């Protein structure tokens, strides 16, 4: 297992290098001139040229790329074109709000999604199944920004129970986490139901029932563990999606996280911040997939030897 983990970690290097090349080319293909945006609408051509020189944008593209990649390999992601702060500081100040929002969203999404999925599988083709799957389809189909605005209108504007924007207290996490986790809970519910339906028809489940074991214990002990392997895969993918896909929710709730930072950076063509964030999101996905593979071995020890 240790050798497998080390090989996967070494595989990070070429993957991240490819991502670094692609994101560098992508940001330089974006329309708009960062120097003009930073200099302001009133700036003349001389001022814009001076700003472009200060940012290093007057150099040939291959020179810019070499400067960028050599600094990245040294752990230096440059300086933000807008704030003039190191990119690492910009990301560090926004990382924790996004991480806590993601964890909060994932916890309730997994709990509710798995509960709905298990209930739908156990009472298949009956009213719990129909109600649960209707809710799941609705959660997947409803756009996140629309759900966020609806929740704000009801619980913040009309009822005045919860704050609308910011991340100062635990109450600020409720509406954004519900909005962000709704689609994930829906996916988890459908995936858990599908996995459990297959498990419930296995021979060992019928054997456990024949021995007189209660249905609740059969489902929780024998069914849950064997149904968890594909569900864990989906959990890992969805966690990565939440970390990198919270852009819309963070924008709606004015959340001080990485998603909003990325949107603001794209608006201002802040190349160093965009490049660093995309690399960070790629690294997160790779590490999450590695953690999922390790969790397989914890759930089913037989996988360790394959």
UniProtKB/Swiss-Prot annotation:
GO terms for cellular component: plasma membrane. SUPFAM superfamilies: MetI-like (SSF161098). It is a multi-pass membrane protein. Residues 1-8, 124-134, 190-228, 300-306 are cytoplasmic. GO terms for biological process: transmembrane transport. It is found in: Cell inner membrane. Residues 95-292 form the ABC transmembrane type-1 domain. The chain crosses the membrane at residues 9-29, 103-123, 135-155, 169-189, 229-249, 279-299. Residues 30-102, 156-168, 250-278 are periplasmic. InterPro entries: BPD_transp_1_N, MetI-like, MetI-like_sf. PANTHER family: DIPEPTIDE TRANSPORT SYSTEM PERMEASE PROTEIN DPPB-RELATED, GLUTATHIONE TRANSPORT SYSTEM PERMEASE PROTEIN GSIC. Part of the ABC transporter complex GsiABCD involved in glutathione import. Probably responsible for the translocation of the substrate across the membrane. This is Glutathione transport system permease protein GsiC. It comes from Salmonella choleraesuis (strain SC-B67).
């Amino acid at each position: 297992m240790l050798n497998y983990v080390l090989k996967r970690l070494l595989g990070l290097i070429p993957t991240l290098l490819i991502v670094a090349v692609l994101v560098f080319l992508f940001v330089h293909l974006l329309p708009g001139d960062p120097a003009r945006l930073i200099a302001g609408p009133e700036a003349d051509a001389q001022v814009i040229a001076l700003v472009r020189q200060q940012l290093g944008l007057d150099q040939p593209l291959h020179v810019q790329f070499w400067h960028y990649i050599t600094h990245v390999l040294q752990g230096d992601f440059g300086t933000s074109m807008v704030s003039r702060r190191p990119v690492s500081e910009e990301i560090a100040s926004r990382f924790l709000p996004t991480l806590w929002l993601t964890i909060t969203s994932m916890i309730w999404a997994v709990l509710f999604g798995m509960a709905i999925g298990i209930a739908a599988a156990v009472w298949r083709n009956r009213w719990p199944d129909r109600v649960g799957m209707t809710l799941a389809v609705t959660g997947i189909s409803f756009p996140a920004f629309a759900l966020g605005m609806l929740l704000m209108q009801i619980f913040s504007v009309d009822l005045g129970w919860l704050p609308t924007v910011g991340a100062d207290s635990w109450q600020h996490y409720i509406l954004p986490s519900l909005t962000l986790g709704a689609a994930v809970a829906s996916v988890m519910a459908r995936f858990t139901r599908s996995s459990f339906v297959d498990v419930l028809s296995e021979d060992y489940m019928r054997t456990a029932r024949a021995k007189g074991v209660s249905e609740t214990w059969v489902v929780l002990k024998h069914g849950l563990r064997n149904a968890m392997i594909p569900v864990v895969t989906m959990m890992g993918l969805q966690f990565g999606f939440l970390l990198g896909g919270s852009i819309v929710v963070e924008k709606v709730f004015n959340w001080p996280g990485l998603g909003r930072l990325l949107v603001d950076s794209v608006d201002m063509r802040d190349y160093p911040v965009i490049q660093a964030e995309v690399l960070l999101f790629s690294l997160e996905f790779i590490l999450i997939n590695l953690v999922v593979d390790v969790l397989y071995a914890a759930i089913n020890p037989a996988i360790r030897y394959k």
